[in-house]
A protein has these predicted regions:
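Beta-strand/loop edge motif enriched in small/polar residues
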Residues: 21-290
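Bacterial Sec-dependent N-terminal signal peptides
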Residues: 1-25
Length: 290
């Protein structure tokens, strides 16, 4: 990490036992950061998109490495459909339409890249910057501490397709592994900034590891309720909060990292870690575990 000239803050959370196999570190030839991460994403050229993703995906769909995809507007995966993304696939987000990918409750994403062939979500602009597009939202049916069993995320989305929450802590929204999310966090008119990755009511069967968020104008990783296991996450030069947990989440996070820079941090409340139970007391049911 000494190669970076800017001010860095390293945030490490580790979980281990004396009988467990030792985890890879972040230095040297065995670093878990090797190959799949990218600390200069604005220098990368992924070419032009030749396929368009738009509207509502209601049947099982596969994205192929041989194509470059343009994500246009709010793209919903719904109707219990499975969106499978091959390793090495690049998805360019259309900055003009505030592109956002929403995996609705009951639907699934299988985005399982490889250490040598990660999946990349990034801006379609030639000169990329934080907040170029929305982000990725996973909605599940695991519990939260809110009143009732169902809530909806804001961000100017379709209310019917943006609900989350339920009673199934063991629910499975799919896999995000060896995935990079770059230049997300677009500002909305009424609800602040998108998060690069929002997990709302996501259950513990969902696999979430080796995910890198770079240059997000909002929060990098935000978790509403649910019961998720997070490992080997990277937040790089996020403007707001790197890791935010809210609404009674029962999350576990280990071996993860935040790299901050004072020149791209928000003066309104930028921090590495935020763990709260609610935004306002009237939102939550204090009798709930979550």
């Amino acid at each position: 990490m000494k190669n970076f000239s800017q001010f860095l803050l390293l945030f490490l959370l580790g979980v281990c036992s004396v009988n467990a196999q030792q985890e890879k570190g972040i230095k040297g030839s065995t670093s878990w950061l090797n190959n799949w991460t990218e600390f200069k994403p604005n220098k990368k050229d992924y070419g032009e998109a030749n396929q368009i993703l738009a509207g509502n995906i209601t049947e099982n769909t596969r994205l192929y490495k041989k194509n470059v995809y343009l994500l246009q507007g709010n793209v919903y995966v719904s109707n219990k459909a499975v969106l499978t993304i091959e390793p090495g696939t690049v998805i360019l987000a259309d900055t003009g339409s505030s592109a956002t990918l929403i995996i609705t409750k009951g639907a699934t994403i299988i985005a399982e890249g490889l250490e040598t062939d990660p999946i990349v979500f990034t801006s379609n602009k030639a000169m990329k910057k934080a907040g170029d597009w929305g982000g990725i939202i996973l909605l599940g049916d695991a519990p939260t501490n809110k009143f009732g069993n169902v809530s909806s995320v804001n961000f100017e989305l379709d209310n019917y397709l943006s609900t989350y929450g339920g009673n199934n802590s063991n629910s499975n929204s799919g896999i995000l592994r060896y995935v990079r999310i770059e230049f997300a966090g677009k500002k909305t008119k009424s609800f602040g900034n998108f998060n690069a990755l929002l997990l709302a009511g996501v259950g513990n069967k969902t696999i979430l590891d080796n995910i890198m968020v770079s240059y997000c104008l909002g929060n990098a990783f935000e978790i509403y309720g649910g019961e998720v296991n997070l490992s080997k996450l990277v937040s790089f030069k996020t403007n707001c909060i790197d890791y935010k947990f809210n609404y009674g989440t029962q999350s576990k996070i280990d071996n993860s990292l935040a790299i901050r820079n004072s020149y791209v941090s928000s003066s309104l409340g930028s921090k590495c870690l935020s763990v709260i139970s609610y935004d306002t007391k009237s939102q939550v049911d204090f009798s709930k575990k979550h």
